[in-house]
Amino acid sequence: MDHAAAQLEKQHVHDVYESTAPYFSDLQSKAWPRVRQFLQEQKPGSLIADIGCGTGKYLKVNSQVHTLGCDYCAPLVEIARSRGCEVMVCDNLNLPFRDQGFDAIISIGVIHHFSTKQRRIRAIKEMARVLVPGGQLMIYVWAMEQKNRHFEKQDVLVPWNKALCSQRLSESGQPGRKQECGHPERGYPYHPACSACHCSVCFEGRCNSKRSHSVDCDSVLAGTCCANISKEGEEENGFYNTLGKSFRSWFSSRSLDESTLRKQIEKVRPLKSTESWANSAISIQPSRHSSFDLGHPETLSAGEQNLDEEVFVEPSQGPREWLRAPTTCKQLNGDHPGVIRRNGDGNFLGGANAKESCVDEGNLEEGTASGSKLWRRISAADSTDSNPGDAISVEEQQPDVLDSRAFMRYYHVFREGELCGLLKESVSELHILSSGNDHGNWCVIAEKRESCD
């Protein structure tokens, strides 16, 4: 199972970040306030590690400490290095540092990219290993409990949209200021694909479910970013707040039942076959107001009544080259990134609940291109757990729809208390100092005990 998880993590996190990294080279964002505060509270001269540093936006927050960033994604590391940061490529599951070497560590949006509980524990324990006794560790992960976003499952796929990275930020009224795509200043820290870039996802549900779709990813099919940017917000952070509301309509994942999804499909018909879109292996759906990496509770715009309709507009008549994924995103088995297959026994990552009625389409990691069908996830109406269920095969989809799956990233969204429970039960060397919800994320600050066996 660990090998299968690693392979899927490579496909749905590592490869995605490596392919999209060039779009971040000219984009920047400020450090998120609570993370900035944590870093500034560290003693002068402290040695701090940012595990999953991405482009390095937290590495220069405090000039009185020495910071070292590391990330699994080499292209992101190169961007951080070009900005004068001290960085290196490494794996969160096997950090190349000696024991008790760092005074503080931050892990912002990394742990939720690990596909199994065991791998999440290993990543946290590895950070605890290199932390000095009395040192502090800050962890941010996506929260399942959010005001304006609903998850049916804890394991979801979230799309990355190239179109938004190309959008001119000058439209917001403050030209010359830059920010990372999908990462507004407040409430949206960049969630890099560090070692924690591991991803396996529950694509399957129960065959006897009354719902025909469980959608965990938002739509990347519309031709333009259609959300109206609100002018509300504080003067200092208004730019990032309002721009973030535009992004949130694209970078989110929530669930819709079949009837709601069909209504949205009827409103928008930019593709040749909307039926094939609705039956896609990873059902893509319109979203309300959520972030790229952090769910923000604010609405998209104060005067909008129907937020679902806002994210659908008539596409422009121009070409949609951005819908097509680069050839570098071809998957391990040679298929399109959106083609999800199961292993030989018909289970996803060794799941034990598969039914005989579910047809096997070849090995998940080592399968050839001979399989011609996709697997559509069907989840039970009230299911919110991440246990794999069953799947049914559906017709092969349009190439453009398959290509749009190239940038689907895996997230394990944490329930309330799950992260704290993980530390208390499995990482005894850490003592929790504080925990809470911060803009759709669970944040935990823990301290390494003075005496650890």
From Swiss-Prot:
Keywords assigned by UniProt, alphabetized: Methyltransferase, Phosphoprotein, S-adenosyl-L-methionine, Transferase, tRNA processing
Molecular-function GO terms, alphabetical: S-adenosylmethionine-dependent methyltransferase activity; tRNA (5-carboxymethyluridine(34)-5-O)-methyltransferase activity; tRNA binding
Presence of the UniProt keyword Protein biosynthesis in the record: no
EC number, UniProt record: 2.1.1.-
Domain of life: Eukaryota
Pfam families with a match to the protein in the record: Methyltransf_11
List of residues that carry Phosphoserine: S214
GO CC, alphabetical: cytoplasm; nucleus
Keyword Methyltransferase annotated: yes
Top EC class for this record: transferase
Disulfide bonds: none
Signal sequence bounds: none
Alphabetized PANTHER family for the sequence: ALKYLATED DNA REPAIR PROTEIN ALKB HOMOLOG 8 (PTHR13069), TRNA METHYLTRANSFERASE 9B-RELATED (PTHR13069:SF36)
Stated family: Belongs to the methyltransferase superfamily.
Function: May modify wobble uridines in specific arginine and glutamic acid tRNAs. Acts as a tumor suppressor by promoting the expression of LIN9.
Annotated protein name in UniProt: Probable tRNA methyltransferase 9B
